[in-house]
């Protein structure tokens, strides 16, 4: 095993850990948004901010997952 392989493995573990953390936060935001809309919260600004954060998390997760996908030379 080469040093570069170890670094790549460490990077992959870090990326997978970050993806997991972001997915948990995304899930928590979804639950919070659902709760606010269920109780009929009139704070649309807060709901909008939560939805925006949720979209940002989804985009970040997609970027990180793309880093784990090997490049295919066509």
Where are these regions (language model features)?
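Short, charge-rich amphipathic alpha-helices with coiled-coil/heptad character
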Residues: 1-9, 36
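Amphipathic, hydrophobic secondary-structure cores in small proteins
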Residues: 12-74
